[in-house]
Swiss-Prot record:
Name of the protein: Photosystem I assembly protein Ycf4
GO biological process, one term: photosynthesis
InterPro entries membership: PSI_Ycf4_assembly
Organism: Trichormus variabilis (strain ATCC 29413 / PCC 7937) (Anabaena variabilis)
Family indicated by similarity: Belongs to the Ycf4 family.
Membrane topology according to the record: Multi-pass membrane protein
Nucleotide-binding as UniProt keyword: no
Function: Seems to be required for the assembly of the photosystem I complex.
GO CC terms: photosystem I; plasma membrane-derived thylakoid membrane
Amino acid sequence: MTASTTINKGDSPNGDSSASSVLHQKVLGSRRFSNYWWASIVTLGASGFLLAGISSYLKVNLLIVTDPTQLIFVPQGLVMGLYGTAGLLLASYLWLAILWDLGGGYNDFNRETGNIKIFRWGFPGKNRKIEIGSRIQDIQSVRIDIKEGLNPRRALYLRVKGRRDIPLTRVGQPLSLAELETQGAQLARFLGVPLEGL
């Protein structure tokens, strides 16, 4: 599954993308399969722990799989209830992050107007919408950042005059090297700037 797709608007019918004047890249945020998976697993596990704690207190079996009424409420049932509560709080955070699509957005490069726009969704509040705009003339290069090891990092950055580097790729699982190089080369060619970091 590709997290960042590139769509050229205004392509010519014969497939030549050189006629395109707008480049739009969709960036996947927290609505990834792995986040749905972990939110579901944590919700199920935490619900089981909480129901086991409540069952040991009420001496009524609320679970299908096992009979937690045999547990002594203090300390086992109480601890299971606390674990369940903590797990449900974590699951709530994961589900809210998915609902809000944290980190999702797009990169828009328009040669007609000479502007770029980087848009991302953040946490609710006054900074919910994160927008960065600049002129295409101010772009110095497209930079590829590759760091291997236990915590690998593979990302594309836009180097803009008078600003710090602007990240263009998603946060989370790193892109493959081939995909990163292809996206970087395509963007550098579109903007007419050098590609750094290879």
